[in-house]
Amino acid sequence: MKIEQIYTGCLAQGAYYIESAGEAVVIDPLREVEPYLERAKADGASIKYVFETHFHADFVSGHIDLAKKSGARIVYGPNAKPSFDAYIAKDGEEFKVGKLTFKVIHTPGHTMESTCYLLKDAQGKHIGLFSGDTLFIGDVGRPDLAQKAAHMTQEQLAETLFDSLRNKIMPLADDIIVYPAHGAGSACGKNMSKETTDTLGNQKKTNYALRADMTKEEFVKEVTTGLLPPPAYFPLNVMMNKEGYDSIDEVLERGQHALSPAAFEVAANETGALILDTRDPQVFAKGFVPNSINIGIDGNFAPWVGALVPDVKQAILLVAEPNRVEEVVTRLARVGYDYTIGFLEGGFEAWEKAGKEVDRIKSITAEELAAIAAKEEIHILDVRKNSEYLSEHVENAENAPLDYVNESMLKVDKNKTYYVHCAGGYR
């Protein structure tokens, strides 16, 4: 028996590959499916099932491509209504994989189709719970994402989640290992631990949402308080996971179309494509293609793309390090941005050598800003979170959190000069 968590840090997402006696199952796979196929090939195993815990909002699953390439059956729990061929399991139904058994445990609340998979060994002992977004380490799934689909309020979904946890999960044995779909940094919860697995017994002791003396009213208040608005791309990812999408092979072929500086310029002017520069921010600031935006690939790339580029169908032209184009196209596709239509061959250096127009960002010190402010009225945009701004901010600065900068730009006077202020780091 093999249980492998395949964790992707930039999405704080855990997929799972489980193999026994020549058969395997993959749970909540990412968009690129080769890693799972390679593992099965190395084990001499066939992938029998692709288990989905729910229709994911924060990433596009690889379930459809993986099923096509491996012959596996896609399985969802009760209430799921996908537009493609899949098996909808009943609560309590069991699936054999080699010498292992997986039991479907329907746990509505995060979404109404949310389902956990209880793993039993050859002797029938319960050894693992693949809990999706129902139960995280230190937290539970937020109950506000499926309100429209479920025709329920977040309070009603929270009540449903409370019942699922108390009736379906908490009665299970303490020594079961919990394998969640996400860890710290995911927007699917608000207080996740940096740990990515734990025993259920320890979670009963330390996870606020599993407190034995907690009333339903207390639970509802706790899980619905302090929820930040979800990223705009979440419902679009749900739709793709439910209705289907282009194969990752098509997306990669389209995105890796090399364009000379001249052809790149024509494409930018004629297609309305967004120019996305994924180089290091410090390098970008020294020179970039006019009208491009910078989201560095070495960081929480996909979530920031989702926050700053509201339309997943937006055509994208890439400026990237030449040896990382495939990586960038793949990471965009993970969150549903499938319409990369080409990249600048030779990178920004080729653009510069071709004598094309170049923009730059000027950085100044706090002392320089203070000196300017002493002489004239200036306009400062503080792009930190509102909580950071309220804690302390530069006098007369206007708060425009980066997560919602598109909305803030509607209020910006294009005839004024703005000084942008942020804390240090990737953001």
Language-model segments: residues:
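Divalent metal-coordination and catalytic microenvironments
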Residues: 18, 28, 54, 66, ...
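Cytosolic catalytic domains that perform sulfur/thiol-centered chemistry
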Residues: 158, 171-173, 187-427
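Core dinuclear metal-dependent hydrolase active-site scaffold
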Residues: 2-6, 16-19, 94-124, 128-129, ...
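Active-site neighborhood of phospho(di)ester-bond hydrolases with catalytic His/Asp-centered motifs
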Residues: 26-27, 47-56, 74-79, 106-109, ...
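Active-site metal-binding loops of divalent metal-dependent hydrolases
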Residues: 29-30, 55, 79, 111, ...
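Metallo-beta-lactamase
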Residues: 111-230
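Active-site metal-binding motif and surrounding structural segment of the metallo-beta-lactamase
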Residues: 33-75
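Conserved beta-strand hairpin/beta-sheet module of binuclear metal-dependent hydrolase folds
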Residues: 1-46, 117-132, 137-138
